[in-house]
């Protein structure tokens, strides 16, 4: 998959655990895990906005495009 989710590195920089983020953005830890592992097929803008708001980051800090060519 050419879209990489760098959520773990941003969480580590902020000193926050996954369960804390899940609680703060009101999603289950299971759904956050699916997102973090790249198994999610999509992400709602409202979820991305909530993540960025809590982590004080930009979407580009979390999402990365890798050209597979």
Question: Whereabouts are the PLM-identified features?
Answer:
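A short, Lys/Arg-rich alpha-helix, primarily the initiator
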Residues: 1-16
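The alpha-helix within a helix-turn-helix
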Residues: 11, 22, 52
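Short alpha-helical DNA-recognition segment
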Residues: 16-34
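Short, charged recognition helix plus adjacent turn
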Residues: 34, 41, 63-69
